[in-house]
Amino acid sequence: MNKIHYLGLSLLAFFPLSEAFATVCVNENGVPTEVYYDLTDKFNSSNNQVGQIVTLSEKSQWVGVNAVCPKGTSGNTTKRSYVTEFPVTGTSDGYQYLKLNDYLDGAMKITDSYAGTFYPPRKYIQMGSHPNVSKNKPFGVQDSSLVFRLKVTRRFINMVVIPRAIMFRVYVTTTSTDPLTTPVYTISYSGTIQVPQSCEINAGNVVEFDFGDIGASLFSKAGIGNKPEGISAQSKTIGIKCTNVEANAMLTMRVEAEKVSGSTLVSDNADVGFVIANSNGVPLTPNNLTSKIPFRLDDSAQAQVGIRAWPVSVTGKKPAEGRFTSRGYLRVDYD
């Protein structure tokens, strides 16, 4: 009797394992399809205000994606999940806004032939039925009418370049407990948003600092983050002329760069870099909204802003001999 009772318990423990079989459907081509949204647009002056929302042109066609569910799938209905890595900053009219950068939030509305209109991110949305779901054959993911909205969170000058990134990864499953492991398609975006408010820096010319020849051993002697002995900082005054920006407006200038280590712009020689500072020698941290030089335009919407620069050791090591350069960008913003 004890032995029979033990076998019965073993069978009962086994049944849930068979029921826990996960149905994760995949793209019929084996890799996720990218559905790309070009955000490039031109705002007018009234659009470039905090809180303003701009609806971009609708992508009205079907996304053109087919999914396949694994063999052994029971039932012919599916669920769809739209997952993002971005934080939701707020909602309005159903739209859930995600932070795209320091100036803009983005949100999307999608229409499905069965589920109707919904606003991602959302998980396990009940979709319709298709006979191919249980047959291990392709079936259409019937998303269409993708509508993208942009909300201004900070006024900007000239333009904002939005690098390519994935906004949503879209998963197809058959239950609300299936893991979200393999996306069927992704929704990505990039673009450039231009505004009428513009400022020309240094009459459109490159601001260049040339420090001549510096002994390689001086960098290793200086140590990480320090200027080589005997090398002086250089100062320049940058002219700024703005258009469609109100006279006497308070603006700021800051530094943007691609290769950065703390407050240092790393050069094409990884052991060497440059520090950009305000006229008092306080370093500016690249790509940091709060590290800036405030200034006020005059009655003709112009200004003069002083900056300083000097070379530093990035690693504390002796750099390879040869010419080294670094590139950064001066960006003017509303204060």
What residue ranges belong to the model's regions?
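Bacterial N-terminal signal peptides that target proteins for export
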Residues: 1-8
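Mature extracellular/passenger domains of Gram-negative fimbrial/pilin and adhesin proteins
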Residues: 21-335
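N-terminal signal peptide c-region/cleavage motif recognized by signal peptidases
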Residues: 15-19
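Cleavable N-terminal signal peptides
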Residues: 9-10, 20
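Intrinsic-disorder-associated interaction segments
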Residues: 1, 13-14, 141
